[in-house]
């Protein structure tokens, strides 16, 4: 995962509704209508949120006729988690500045 993809995911996660949607999807695949039941938003607003989550590959969408079913993309989350681990403070050690 490159920095651009990572930043795009961080931006997507910056909205509490999208975080709530992702938490709902941890239970498994859900129809858009089921997700919508949990929010006080319009269908078009939900579609906007789902497009953002889908565009950065956090969720996968499966179409069945007029219905859309969403699920978490575990591969993307695994890669995102790896990048978070790479920039963790746990590995931070003091080093001498070379410009002295």
Regions found by a protein language model. Give the residues of each.
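Alpha-helical residues within the helix-turn-helix
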Residues: 37, 54-55
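Base-recognition residues in the alpha-helical recognition helix of bacterial helix-turn-helix
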Residues: 23, 47-49, 66
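Divalent metal-coordination and catalytic microenvironments
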Residues: 46, 53, 70
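Amphipathic alpha-helical dimerization/coiled-coil segments
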Residues: 2-5, 74-100
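Beta-hairpin "wing" of winged helix-turn-helix
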Residues: 55-64, 71
């Amino acid at each position: 995962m490159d920095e651009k993809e990572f930043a795009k995911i961080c931006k997507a996660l910056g909205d509490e509704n999208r975080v709530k949607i992702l938490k709902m999807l941890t239970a498994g695949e859900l129809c858009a209508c089921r997700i919508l039941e949990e929010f006080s938003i319009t269908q078009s607003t939900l579609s906007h949120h789902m497009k953002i989550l889908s565009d950065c590959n956090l969720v996968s969408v499966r179409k069945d006729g007029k219905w859309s079913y969403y699920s978490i993309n575990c591969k993307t989350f695994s890669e995102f988690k790896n990048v978070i681990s790479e920039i963790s403070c746990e590995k931070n050690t003091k080093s001498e500045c070379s410009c002295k």
